[in-house]
C-alpha cells in the first residue's frame, strides 16, 4: 500500500496541498480554466485534471511550477 511508505505518503500530502492551493486561487480570482491555463503556461486539460482532483496525473514539479506562475508561494501553500 502506497501510504505505508513515508516518502509516498508525504508526496501525496504535498500534491494534495498544492492542488488545493491552486484550486482555491483559481476560484478566488474568478478565473476560467482557460485563463488559469494561460497564466500557468499549461494546457487547459491540465487545469481540468487539477480541478477534478486527478492527483495521480500530476507531478510535484508540475504543481510547484503551476502554483509559482499563479504567484503562490509553494512553500507556504504546503505548510
Please name every model-derived segment:
Residues 1-21:
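N-terminal flexible/basic segments that precede or flank functional cores
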Residues 60-76:
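DNA major-groove recognition helix of helix-turn-helix/homeodomain DNA-binding modules
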Residues 30-48:
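Short alpha-helical DNA-recognition segment
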Residues 54-60:
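Short, solvent-exposed alpha-helical "recognition" segments
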Residues 26, 37, 67:
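The alpha-helix within a helix-turn-helix
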Residues 22, 33, 63:
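Generic structural marker for isolated residues within well-ordered, non-membrane alpha-helices
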